[in-house]
């Protein structure tokens, strides 16, 4: 069969497998690639075996070492990038650093065990970092003879998901066996195809970066005599056009409004700048000293300056170049947001005495001056210019 060209017109979606250790996340990932390669042979659909996925290369994301396997495959409708983090610690780091932005995930639960401690932790983390759509794959059903037991496990999983504000009663639960599908058992291969069509239907297509409201972290500011003030940086999301009204947010309590009178890239005038572009934006009615690095240009009303938030953080281990000693309540490091460091104090959860290097923990942060943040904003925790932790904003408090 002739291999067709990679079709860019298919929507692209990022997903991953999550769940307790040894419940079959990697086996399921292998089964999906293998069954799709058999049933829908294309140049993209290549079978990956367990060993090649499990031997995930080490990556460094914001100074943190993470093992993650990236595989790709496609269904009739979509192209998928799928991440599988082999170890529990890798999964936690992946979620918190934003190394793996997932639009949705497949929660793998072994029917022989039911939900386990990491099942719970992964569901909580998904909720905290904004993975809104989960599908459940109950694995290893071939090892359970008792139909009632499977029903009990399914109820238990649904209750657990509801506890963390997922639609536990309504979200899809598919029962199958990744290993049997991998071995070529047709009944279980059909279930993998059913799982993939469920993923196609249930996980919505992500909003493209260019469709989101403008956010441009300011890296540099200069003035052009006779023309005004230019703020430059890389557009994080959205678009910016001449005559757009924008807001300058962060560092100061007040939000300042401005009008865009020019957009330049590589010294050329543009009609518009798009997400990913490095641009200079000429602003009318803004003095050189009224805007600075660390602020953002944003679509009016889309983001506000805040000083207090809850965050989910991972603290680097000594081996990763992090701290050698624990820290305690009221620890005051710098928080690096996009382009700038801001000092802040950390309040630990009740009952947590200290945080050791290599731990992950929920913290409350109070910054000394406001920064444009929202749920899902990532940050680094630094001490004297070196990264000692990585986090993501889970809730805005003030």
UniProtKB/Swiss-Prot annotation:
Region listing for G4, in residue ranges: 139-142
Subunit notes for this chain?
Monomer.
Which Pfam family is one of those matched by this entry? GTP_EFTU_D2
What is this protein's gene name? Answer: tuf
- UniProt KW keywords: Cytoplasm, Elongation factor, GTP-binding, Hydrolase, Magnesium, Metal-binding, Nucleotide-binding, Protein biosynthesis
**Region G3: which residues?**
84-87
EC primary class = hydrolase
Record region (G2): 63-67
Residues bound to Mg(2+): 26
> Which molecular-function annotation in GO is an example for this chain?
GTPase activity
Its function, per the record, reads: GTP hydrolase that promotes the GTP-dependent binding of aminoacyl-tRNA to the A-site of ribosomes during protein biosynthesis.
Q: What is this protein called?
A: Elongation factor Tu
- According to its UniProt record, the EC number is 3.6.5.3
Q: What is its main location?
A: cytoplasm
Q: Provide the residue span(s) of the region labelled G1.
A: 19-26
Q: Which HAMAP family match?
A: EF_Tu_B (MF_00118_B)
Q: Which parts of the sequence bind GTP? A: 19-26, 84-88, 139-142
